């Protein structure tokens, strides 16, 4: 099944890609019937893949792994100055192959297929820089919170340190346990009824966000995106987090700001 979509972002810059230019082919890899090699027809356009399995990738070629049997919709979006166009194809994976879940990011984030299959993460509140901010774009100093870095327990009582974030491998499920409140940037307080000023920003009543999902975008700077309604740490209006460092028990993230101009930083640890 092939589905197409087109978006013309700026007609003054020319036409968006054609249907033919947005097409792609796939083939079964030599390593596993559950691993597909994807190739965009247009090698010179910016290409964004959604494998339909909770993973995204960029580039004219990509490799998609499907540990679980089922039908998946692969989506390719190609971009030029005139806009974008998307096409999709459905693929059927006949058998489950759990060995494909040995992705190191999956394993560190969730415990992996041979472990518990989920991990609970919390803010590493006793570490300097567990929350911080710097410029966007980054300065020559790089990925550091050069403008401000929280000291140990700086935000105690703000509704941040008792939050829990549970990443589950099966179905890429994500649960956000708030214990009744969250900590949000002052510019977003109006979106949270009942919020009140606290330690420079706002604490807001907010219930648990259960049965959400998380999505990994792989590459040189892998990112995690959580689904609407959920988020990680101090809320700045974005849902995508760049992984700066990830071990079996610690995680450092960088993320943006809804109005631009800022990069926020977060340190977490396993519970």
Question: Model-predicted segments: where are they?
Answer:
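Generic short beta-strand segments
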Residues: 43, 123-130, 178-181, 225-231, ...
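Extracellular/lumenal mature domains of secreted and surface-exposed proteins
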Residues: 5-120, 125-127, 242-247, 262-264
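Short, solvent-exposed loop/hinge segments that bridge or flank secondary-structure elements
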Residues: 123-171, 176, 262-264
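Short, exposed beta-strand-loop hairpins at the edges of beta-sheets
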Residues: 250-260
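Bacterial N-terminal signal peptides
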Residues: 1-3
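Short, low-complexity, Pro/Ser/Thr/Gly-rich segments in the mature regions of secreted, periplasmic
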Residues: 261-271
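Contiguous, well-ordered beta-strand patches that form the walls/edges
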Residues: 151-246
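Short helix-loop boundary/capping segments
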Residues: 185-188, 254, 269-271
